Amino acid sequence: MSLADLIRQIPVLEAAGGSTTSLPVSMISSDSRDVLPGALFIAVRGYSADGHRFIKSAVERGAAAVLCEEIPPVLPDASLPYLRVEDARQALALAARQFYGFASDALHVIGVTGTNGKTTTARLITAMLNACGIRTGYIGTNLCTFGEQQIPLDRTTPEAHILHALFRRMLDSGCSVAVMEVSSHALVLQRVYGITFHAAVFTNLSMEHLDFHKTMQEYAGAKRQLFEQLSPQGFAVINSDDPRAEEMVSKINPEKRFCCTLDQTGRVAGDASRRFSAELIDQSIASATIRLCFPDAQQTISTVLPGQYNVMNLLQAAAVGCGMGLGSPVVAAALDALPGVAGRMERIMDRRRKEFVFVDYAHTPDALFKALSTLNALKSPASRLIVVFGCGGNRDRLKRPEMGRIAVENADLVILTSDNPRDEDPEMIIDEIEKGIRVKNHKRITDRAQAIRTAVALLQPGDVLLVAGKGHEQYQETAGEKSFFSDQETLRNALAEENAGEPEKGAVCKGC
């Protein structure tokens, strides 16, 4: 594609250097390290680094043109075109959309946003639609999937040029729908700018990312942007029990709202023909039976996902299915057949043991409280609930003491450990968690593997262990370096060590 075609929809304020008339562009990048000969390098001001500092590096690696907010006073190569725009992030999104042939316009894009539940809800929607014969791709926390393809990602919502490249690959593989998690960072940083969503889902809003957004009002405003990009023909699915629900969809036509409620009322007005509710009929530590109340019928399903919050996740997936034109019996049958979601209340099975061991991604105060409350309600009164968790480095520090308080108030034993300390001292992170702890039912073991092994060694028959924070993640990030780490693998090895044998072969469950 020529540079002239690529920037056709981008207002260029100033140009310097060479001509743009027929210059071919082979790729788009905002990371100078990824630049190959013929690339358009777009200098974006990032959260921790400014792309303008790397223009020279991009040119040295073969960039054919540079798009930026400030043209360098001395051009690294005056034969190349340098184009100044007002907003490089918007330009990146528009250029990527053009470069990849407007693939997002040809897909039904479903966006899922909220503090907790994004991954579970998005993965449930994806699996449900695929089970119903609708070829659907998924983009979310550290992973993109479509068909047999699995592509690792480094964030929940990729940068715009990566995102549109994935849309193109999905479309070329035969997908008609793309389900994606949309983070508040992605909305503020305009990674999804220019994308029209066929459906938008709001799960909930609670304390998180206040290092970035500063206030809850600012955080809510970021989430609301998703609904401002909803197609006029699209629909919104909302957790109407959440206090922020009305705020999210205040500008959406009530006829385009699908309201999901567990308390049978909800906080958002909506027509009964678009109201969904659910009732948890029965649950054990291994499964649950749920009655889904569609506008036109009631359907009963079973699931390996425990807890009221997972009832809402399933209900919202059901509402999306109906919004896509699927009948309630078809939706219910698809949801009933689904396995669990990796790292979301994932049970680690060892049939030689009589304890219950779970891995969950809970890394916010609200998510940790809900996970612990769910397991407390399901365990026997004589059994103990043990939790192993930590807080991420270089992230919201305000939540650390709150998570410490929640843990000790809702578990019999708490083991504080490391969870991606990044550039922070892991001992100092644990110190901050301990500020919220007023009782002494906790230990601190900085080494996460040792913390997990200690927890397993302390288990008695009937006890419940929750290892929280990482979920599906397969790494530990320390001092800027990522190394392989799996809570699941560490737990299986620890259980095998306690059994004085090897991990049991074939010990799996529907949700593993």
From Swiss-Prot:
It is found in: Cytoplasm. Pfam families: Mur_ligase (PF01225), Mur_ligase_C (PF02875), Mur_ligase_M (PF08245). UDP-N-acetyl-alpha-D-muramoyl-L-alanyl-D-glutamate binds at residues 32, 156-157, 183, 191. A motif (Meso-diaminopimelate recognition motif) lies at residues 419-422. The keyword Iron does not apply. Its EC number is 6.3.2.13. Keywords: ATP-binding, Cell cycle, Cell division, Cell shape, Cell wall biogenesis/degradation, Cytoplasm, Ligase, Magnesium, Nucleotide-binding, Peptidoglycan synthesis. It catalyses: UDP-N-acetyl-alpha-D-muramoyl-L-alanyl-D-glutamate + meso-2,6-diaminopimelate + ATP = UDP-N-acetyl-alpha-D-muramoyl-L-alanyl-gamma-D-glutamyl-meso-2,6-diaminopimelate + ADP + phosphate + H(+). ATP binds at residues 114-120. Meso-2,6-diaminopimelate binds at residues 395, 419-422, 469, 473. Belongs to the MurCDEF family. MurE subfamily. Its main location: cytoplasm. One of its GO terms (cellular component) is cytoplasm. Pathway: Cell wall biogenesis; peptidoglycan biosynthesis. This is UDP-N-acetylmuramoyl-L-alanyl-D-glutamate--2,6-diaminopimelate ligase. It is an enzyme of class 6 (ligase). One of its GO terms (molecular function) is UDP-N-acetylmuramoylalanyl-D-glutamate-2,6-diaminopimelate ligase activity. The modification N6-carboxylysine is found at residue 223. GO terms for biological process: cell division; cell wall organization; peptidoglycan biosynthetic process; regulation of cell shape. Catalyzes the addition of meso-diaminopimelic acid to the nucleotide precursor UDP-N-acetylmuramoyl-L-alanyl-D-glutamate (UMAG) in the biosynthesis of bacterial cell-wall peptidoglycan. Carboxylation is probably crucial for Mg(2+) binding and, consequently, for the gamma-phosphate positioning of ATP. Its cofactor is Mg(2+). InterPro entries: Mur-like_cat_sf, Mur_ligase_C, Mur_ligase_C_dom_sf, Mur_ligase_cen, Mur_ligase_N, MurE/MurF_N, UDP-N-AcMur-Glu-dNH2Pim_ligase.
